[in-house]
Regions:
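Hydrophobic/aromatic-rich alpha-helical bundle segments in the mid-to-C-terminal region
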Residues: 98-145, 153-156
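Hydrophobic recognition helices of helix-based DNA-binding modules
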Residues: 19, 23, 27, 31, ...
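Hydrophobic alpha-helical connector segments
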Residues: 18, 22, 32-60, 115
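Helix-turn-helix
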Residues: 1-14, 18
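Amphipathic alpha-helical segments used for helix-helix packing
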Residues: 56-78, 95, 121-128
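Hydrophobic/aromatic residues within well-ordered alpha-helical segments
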Residues: 12, 19, 23-27, 50, ...
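Short, flexible helix-adjacent loops and helix caps
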Residues: 32-40, 63, 70-73, 99-103, ...
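Amphipathic alpha-helical packing segments from all-alpha helical-bundle domains
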Residues: 25, 29, 57, 75-102, ...
């Protein structure tokens, strides 16, 4: 019944945001777990690995790609919590990776926002429709662009 629904959710958008947050948190949880099993020599390698792992998961599940990409706003992303990892936020994963590098960055949240939005926007058509290039071609360019963004925001 409609009344029962509102005991758990504010409105239909609340349930959608919670579903998106749940699915997105699982993507990041898997990517972070896989990243921890590997060894990297640079911050760039870690970030690129994390991003590529998420992209590969979305490529394997196109329905999830459609659902998440159309509805994942920055406000939702920046507050997604990963319950299997002590309820940390997805943003905390990025903060931890950046902190481990012992490098300083200006406007970290803006930098992460730009990476997330770049990847989300550019992968949509490539994953779902195979245009304007293959996913492997796009990932090669994204890798360079992500490294460039990290360099651009680094404080010397």
């Amino acid at each position: 019944a409609k009344g029962t629904f509102y005991l758990y959710f504010k409105d239909k958008y609340d349930i959608r945001h919670r579903l998106i947050a749940n699915k997105a948190s699982r993507l990041f949880e898997r990517a972070e777990e896989a990243m921890r099993k590997e060894e990297f020599s640079t911050l760039e390698e870690k970030v690129v690995f994390l991003v590529n792992h998420v992209v590969d998961q979305l490529n394997e599940n196109k329905a999830l790609m459609r659902f998440i990409s159309k509805n994942l706003s920055w406000a939702v992303f920046s507050h997604i919590r990963i319950s299997n990892m002590g309820n940390i936020k997805c943003m905390d994963i990025f903060d931890e990776i950046l902190g481990e590098s012992n490098r300083k960055f200006r406007q970290k949240e803006l930098m992460i926002y730009m990476i997330v939005e770049l990847v989300s926007a550019s992968c949509y058509s490539v994953i779902l429709y195979g245009t304007p290039c293959s996913l492997e071609e796009l990932k090669a360019e994204l890798d360079k662009t992500i490294c460039g963004l990290l360099k651009q925001f680094e404080v010397e």
